[in-house]
Amino acid sequence: MNIFRFLGDISHLSAIIILLLKIWKSRSCAGISGKSQLLFAIVFTTRYLDLFTNFISFYNTSMKVVYVASSYATVWMIYSKFKATYDGNHDTFRVEFLIVPTAILSFLVNHDFTPLEILWTFSIYLESVAILPQLFMVSKTGEAETITSHYLFALGIYRTLYLFNWIWRYQFEEFFDLIAIVAGLVQTVLYCDFFYLYITKVLKGKKLSLPA
Amino acid sequence: SVNGLKHDEL
């Protein structure tokens, strides 16, 4: 485990906790895309099926369990507990445009044509684009709460840190996974515009708002 | 070699 991977995991975990706490403390999921959260629940479920087949470490297992459990808790809060505060009118991204192509691609480009491996590949592809409904919602409403911006930054920087982890692993362990690397690059590129706004606005104490 | 099958990351 190198420092980039560890910091990536910590930032991913922070993002998940920031979102859970934001919704729970404010008793509201305003400004949060339920569709993106649903996609993340699908991502974790399909990727971590190896919890039942493969043990890597106590760290690995506990993180997976926390990610899966918190993604379901978030979906439950948005679609059940705090349903009245969910802004479905602005959450209009068509998720089938993400699920269908990534599902097809995972059948075509994978490391091994087995059910578990195809599901893992699907989860990698789907994760790379799962934030789009959330980014679409922010661009549609033209603004995001500061706490939501922190959530998005932590979530975006996690995969960026993983890119450095993969460079490290290629250099020192001769390990590389082209599927994860390409998807990770796509995922990071999707956040670039948001990173720019976060650094130029949110870090200077302003609310993230887009020009009309 | 491509060793992507070792899924030891999160």
Swiss-Prot record, chain A:
Spans traversing the lipid bilayer? 5-24, 33-52, 59-79, 93-110, 117-135, 150-168, 179-199
Q: Does the keyword Membrane apply?
A: yes
Segments on the Cytoplasmic face: 25-32, 80-92, 136-149, 200-212
Spell out the residue ranges making up region: Interaction with the K-D-E-L motif on target proteins: 47-48, 159-169
* Single GO MF descriptor: ER retention sequence binding
Q: Where is this site: Important for recycling of cargo proteins with the sequence motif K-D-E-L from the Golgi to the endoplasmic reticulum?
A: 193
Q: Which Pfam families match?
A: ER_lumen_recept (PF00810)
InterPro entries the UniProt entry points to = ER_ret_rcpt (IPR000133)
Membrane topology term reads: Multi-pass membrane protein
Segments for region (Important for recycling of cargo proteins with the sequence motif K-D-E-L from the Golgi to the endoplasmic reticulum): 204-207
Per the record, ranges on the Lumenal side are: 1-4, 53-58, 111-116, 169-178
Provide a GO biological process annotation.
Answer: protein transport
Q: Which GO terms describe its cellular component?
A: cis-Golgi network; COPI-coated vesicle membrane; endoplasmic reticulum; endoplasmic reticulum membrane; endoplasmic reticulum-Golgi intermediate compartment membrane; Golgi membrane
Chain positions of site Interaction with the K-D-E-L motif on target proteins: 5, 117
Indicate where this protein is primarily found.
Golgi
| Similarity remark | Belongs to the ERD2 family.
Q: What is this protein called?
A: ER lumen protein-retaining receptor 1-B
Q: Which organism is it from?
A: Xenopus laevis (African clawed frog)
